[in-house]
C-alpha cells in the first residue's frame, strides 16, 4: 500500500514523499491516520536531526516519519493481534514506549509510523507496551490531543506534590 508522509532526513530536512509501505507481518497492524496534532517537539527533532535523542543516527539513509500526536483507525491486523484489534477500530497512540529502555518512539524513530502520514505500519513494540489505545470519541482531532493532555497531567502530578514519589497533596 502506498502512503504519503513527511519524512525527516536530517537537520531542517523534511520531505513530503509518497512511497510503498511493506506488507505487514503477523505482529504488526496497518492503520490510517486521520488527525495529527503539531507539537514543538517535532520542530525540535527537525532542528536537531540525528542529534536529537529520539532520532536515529542513520536518519539521512533511513528517514523517519514525523508526528507523534495522532489518532486514526485500524485497516488490517496481523494474526498475533486479531483477538484484540479489528479493522475499523479507532485508536490513539501513546508514543512514549520506553520499550526495553529505548527512547525510540513513533513520530521520531521509525520509518513506517508517524502521525504525518496517510497510512502507517504499527510495529509490535507499540502493542507490547500497551500504547495502541482504543478511542471511542466522536472527532479524531480530540484523540490526537490525548498525548499532549497526558503531558499536562504528568507535569501536574510531578510538580504539585511536596515530596517526590508521594502523591499526597500539600
Model segments located where?
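Extreme N-terminal starter segment of soluble prokaryotic enzymes
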Residues: 2-4
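NAD(P)H dinucleotide-binding glycine-rich loop of Rossmann-like/cofactor-binding domains
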Residues: 97-170
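Local cysteine-cluster metal-coordination motifs and their immediate loop/turn environment
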Residues: 40
Amino acid at each position: 500500500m502506498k502512503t504519503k508522509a513527511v519524512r525527516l532526513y536530517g537537520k531542517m530536512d523534511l520531505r513530503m514523499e509518497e512511497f510503498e509501505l511493506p506488507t505487514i507481518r503477523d505482529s504488526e497492524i496497518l492503520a490510517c491516520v486521520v488527525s495529527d496534532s503539531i507539537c514543538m517537539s517535532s520542530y525540535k527533532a527537525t532542528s536537531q536531526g540525528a542529534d536529537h535523542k529520539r532520532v536515529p543516527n542513520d536518519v539521512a539513509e533511513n528517514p523517519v516519519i514525523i508526528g507523534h500526536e495522532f489518532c486514526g483507525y485500524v485497516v488490517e491486523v496481523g494474526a498475533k493481534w486479531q483477538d484484540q484489534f479489528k479493522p475499523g477500530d479507532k485508536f490513539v497512540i501513546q508514543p512514549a514506549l520506553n520499550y526495553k529502555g529505548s527512547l525510540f518512539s513513533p513520530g521520531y524513530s521509525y520509518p513506517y509510523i508517524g502521525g504525518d502520514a496517510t497510512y502507517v505500519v504499527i510495529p509490535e513494540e507499540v502493542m507490547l507496551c500497551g500504547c495502541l489505545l482504543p478511542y471511542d470519541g466522536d472527532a479524531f482531532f480530540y484523540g490526537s490531543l490525548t498525548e499532549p493532555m497526558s503531558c499536562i497531567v504528568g507535569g501536574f502530578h510531578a510538580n504539585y506534590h511536596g515530596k517526590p514519589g508521594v502523591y499526597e497533596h500539600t
